[in-house]
Amino acid sequence: MSLWGQPLQASPPLAVRQPPTASSGPSTSPPAGATLNRLPEPLLRRLSESLDRAPEGRGWRQLAELAGSRGRLRLSGLDLEQCSLKVLEPEGSPSLCLLKLMGEKGCTVTELSDFLQALEHTEVLPLLNPPGLKITVNPESKAVLAGQFVKLCCRATGHPFVQYQWFKMNKEIPYGNSSELVFNTVHVKDAGFYVCRVNNSSTFEFSQWSQLDVCDVAEVTDSFQGSMDGISESRLQICVEPRSQRLVPGSMLLLQCVAIGSPMPHYQWFKDESPLTHETKKHYTVPYVDIEHEGTYWCHVYNDRDSQDSKKAEVTIGRTDEAVECTEDELNNLGHPDNKEQTGQPLAKDKVALLIGNMSYWEHPKLKAPLVDVYELTNLLRQLDFKVVSLLDLTEYEMCNAVDEFLLLLDKGVYGLLYYAGHGYENFGNSFMVPVDAPNPYRSENCLCVQNILKLMQEKETGLNVFLLDMCRKRNDYDDTIPILDALKVTANIVFGYATCQGAEAFEIQHSGLANGIFMKFLKDRLLEDKKITVLLDEVAEDMGKCHLTKGRQALEIRSSLSEKRALTDPVQGAPCSAEALVRNLQWAKAHELPESMCLKFQCGVHIQLGFAAEFSNVMIIYTSIVHKPPEIIMCDAYVTDFPLDLDIDPKHANKGTPEETGSYLVSKDLPKHCLYTRLSSLQKLKEHLIFTVCLSYQYSGLEDTVEEKQEVNVGKPLIAKLDMHRGLGRKTCFQACRMPDEPYHSSTSTSAGAGHFHSSQDSFHDVYHSHLGNADSGMPPDRCHCSRTPHTFISNYPPHHYCQFGRSNVPVETTDEMPFSFSDRLMISEN
């Protein structure tokens, strides 16, 4: 039951279950137990006028006689004479005098109503008992598809009129003052809990809560997209089907089924025709699968009006999904695949991926697609058994340290993959990734050179080096430095997948509030295919070429020296772990440790559950919920605050009712409902333990004052913060283009400050790989530099000149009505 005595269709978060404040104020109708002297003067006069005009036998004298029958209300003869004399006054009223005397003796509104009923004064009874409000139609919870026309309805009856006001959670909706709340085109951000307040001139009531769940079009199954034109707001339809998967033991299984319809759909998962206990959400997750999880899965979706079954998904656990014949000797050798000739397939010693998405640039146009691209690629690579580190919005110094940590995870035979989405450029065949703190304009000393990173990866004798660069490759006219790099080793294991051709721009598709880069939109559909990586990228290029959105704008370019049939699906070698592998696994595991869920118990008896979820390696969601409240507490509200200044958290975006309100659109389906959510980003900046405060405010029944309690929580260093990337590894690897010998090594940007000094870190495993750090006083150890410069001055194609204000050309490309998506140019460099 809700706080107003009505059953809830869907429970909103505990912190907002109290109804929003009514703008009409307290009720003006007289309480039944109130005495007459508390009635408003206008109401008393209207009652007295009716009694003064009443026919004989139903007037004020008969009212006095009825009141006298209840001893305490008996009036004396002097009192009645006083009432009679009122007729001699110009505006005197015997009835008004009588009502006031009865009020002084404690006559209640209920008693007066009984007296008037006995005297058959039915015409004035509504003044004391106005017809109450009655909600006849409550809004219905529903699940819809982004872009649909959606309508929430509330109907009520009352006297003399009814007014409406809609709320989302506890926030009033502007212009939501009719009986219908209409979304001409509903968006993902519109998802949440809604309630309608109805009021007349004297009182107000609240409707039942209604939950609106909005499914993103990007998640919709291809087979469903073909029938979207005839979609119904009310009919139950499954729009996202679970997909078959081939997994290895220890990986995560995630099956998803999403339906739309009204009333709100419910879910029940099945495995091999048997229902799975407590699995009643859109998604079914097994963090670490084993052979016992192999089978056929499907989901039964239903509501009060209809039901449907999803398609069946086959989940296969193991190295291969094919049966093979082998001898006893071959069977004994399966546990020791010492060489790839035994299996006929290349083996990876391990698989490691670094994913960087830069969006929130300080001095340049902001991007949207890296958020979605990095998240989706992370999930796909984990299905392929990659150890993935995914990071958003890194400065130059943080990018250098992230690559350093990435290099520590590499070793002989390990597959290394680097994905970058953000601003970038290419000069003289060298690709440069632009950090979020790059100045305006930027040059090579402010950016990271991809070719230098490749050189360092080759030193690790990796089995495969894959670079996926989703950035622009136009020339930077502000950077006329020509770095001369040392020749790369001939390793025949290098693959570059460029999102666009040399000299061209890369674009992102914006739709339903989220965005995909064009490259990732097509790559994600093929990444899990068991094909040679170059063949896979060729097919992605063909897919892009067939799309009318990309023709003449963007085309995938592939550069490769791969001489073996290596694929991202290659199995990881099952040999016993070496010391280096153990350190590598520990280093990666440390960067992905979440704080354990905890239950805080306050002195008042309230219990608050704290939970944590990772969106990226440097982004964490904190969700809070009130799991126990003593009955004597009628209202309680919990929130988190006082975060370290390193994280720069905006309080306005904390403690929200939905993950989407915090800016987290991607993990909302995996988080528990009915909580308050806070998103912590840039965890790599955290210098000390993550300490924050949980505040609880509550109110006891019968008391108006609100009581507050606080508890301080220390969760250590979560996720990537454990690696202390802000300290670095005691060196600054030469990822930038080298400068003149007589130039200072450090750039003028603040991000490089202190990079040449050694800071020891107990969380860094650098000493395992590099026992000699070189001269700690040197700005750049000579053994870390792999590029050289032309003597004296740099080579320039343009004469020296002064640069004026740097122009920004990130203007969306014009589209026609036939192109439903808008383009946003990732290019940062432009000519004035």
Curated annotation (Swiss-Prot):
Keywords: Acetylation, Cytoplasm, Disulfide bond, Hydrolase, Immunity, Immunoglobulin domain, Nucleus, Phosphoprotein, Protease, Repeat, Ubl conjugation pathway
Record domain Death: where: 45-132
Ranges of residues in domain Ig-like C2-type: 131-207, 218-314
EC number: 3.4.22.-
PROSITE patterns registered for this protein in UniProt: CASPASE_P20, IG_LIKE
Biased composition (Low complexity): 19-39
Modified residues (N-acetylserine): 2
SUPFAM superfamilies reported in the protein's UniProt record: Caspase-like, DEATH domain, Immunoglobulin
Record field: transmembrane: none
Disulfide pattern: 154-196, 257-299
Family: Belongs to the peptidase C14B family.
Protein name: Mucosa-associated lymphoid tissue lymphoma translocation protein 1 homolog
